Amino acid sequence: MLNKLKRAALGAHTPHDKATAASKPVPMPLPAQVRILMSQHIGAPAKALVKKGDEVFVGTKIGEAGGFVSANIHSSVSGTVAAVEPFRLSNGRMCDSVVIKTDGKQTVDPAVKAPEVTDKASFLAAVRECGLVGLGGAGFLTDVKLQPKQTVDTLLINASECEVWLTSDTQEMLNCSDDIVRGIEAVLKYTGIPKCVIGIENNKPECIELLNQKTKDKPAIEVKALPSVYGTGAELILIEKCLGREVPHGGLPADAGAIVMNVTSVSTLGKYLATGMPVVERTITVDGDACAKPQNLIVPVGTAYEDVLNAAGIKGGVELGKVVAGGAMMGPAVENLSYPTTKTTSGLIMLSAAAAEPPQVNPCIRCGRCVEYCPMGLEPVEVNQAYAARDVQELGKLHVDYCFNCGSCTFVCPAKRPCTQMMGLAKAFYLGEIKKGGNK
């Protein structure tokens, strides 16, 4: 399958709308309250450790990991717990949340101090304690990722940031390069992985130059410039482009000898090792054609979307039509502006009513562009037919489970068909049928 990918898949050339690429992150005004979710990661929710009326500080642990595949949660503000209550997640499920009224002081918890790391066990314990997850959007537990059963020879840092509008990773590279290197060196030292490759798209020459400079005397770390084609940041594509390896069907990056970390994740790890401050804030890109002041904001975890948007403002005379959480290609539309930011929130895109207007959908003209530009070499046209017939075996032959909903097929479709949504439905149907043994 991936041999075909190497020969045929091109990937879409999305607009290089990076108006905030030079926008150095600045702290947003402190909100009156935050709502911190106990589920911000893949795996079991954390268990709330606080109750109404408790005083908390920046860095106070307010949620204990609820299992091996779970993450600690820390307060992003100082103040008083106003409530511990259920909250509906964007996927429809319920989880506990901790509502904190801020006191405006941002007092740091006295317990926050740099961890003592002397060996692999203490390193992994420190990573787990700080609540670090994949900050590129996946939210997988970093300490679990760093304990693969397979033999791994490469730490691969995903610094491609190919999503339209997003520049928070770019700013992390430009402003926190020492933290990035510190995090990488710690991973290599304590896990025994011999080398690291940092993959950066070639439309970020300043980042490539800076990280080359920072690692010039570090032979274990290589900076690799990648083609600026949308989809490069997907793990399977990144591994193929950086290492020339294929991940087996249904496998993990570790099956190809690699561990992949987002560049902001490894930078956050570097900061934690130096300061002891857990994951309590992150840089969020706020942009879009309805945004008055596109910028990168440093946002406390748990801040309501509407508070972040108000900090950037809406253009005068422009009607806000839609807000997208994450990048314009893969991010979901926001239903509720009171929804809180999480560790994995990388951007909020403000679209005008005109830009958000759904296009006129026309019949498929069988042009094949969705096939030509799929970065995974899939065939959305054929998948659509197989899904319409509920043909599980054919969906398997078409490798629908390789789809990662990048949006390329919808982006290039001249008929404006919702190809990505169809692929998502087909994949969910296929995986559900396989799980229960359907179409035998």
Regions found by a protein language model. Name each.
Residues L174-K189:
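Histidine-anchored nucleotide/phosphate-binding helix
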Residues G134, L155-D169, A290:
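Gly-rich Lys/Arg/Thr-decorated short loops/hinges at beta-loop-alpha junctions or inter-strand turns
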Residues S346-V361, V371, P375-K440:
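Ferredoxin-type iron-sulfur electron-transfer modules in oxidoreductases and energy-metabolism complexes
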Residues K51-E64, A83:
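Short, well-structured beta-strand-loop connectors
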Residues A83, R88-K145, K149-Q150, P205:
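Acidic low-complexity segments
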Residues M1-L49, V99:
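N-terminal, Lys/Arg-enriched amphipathic/low-complexity engagement segments
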Residues G79-V81:
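Conserved hydrophobic positions within beta-strands
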Residues I193-Y305, A311-G316, G327:
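Hydrophobic alpha-helical positions that pack around
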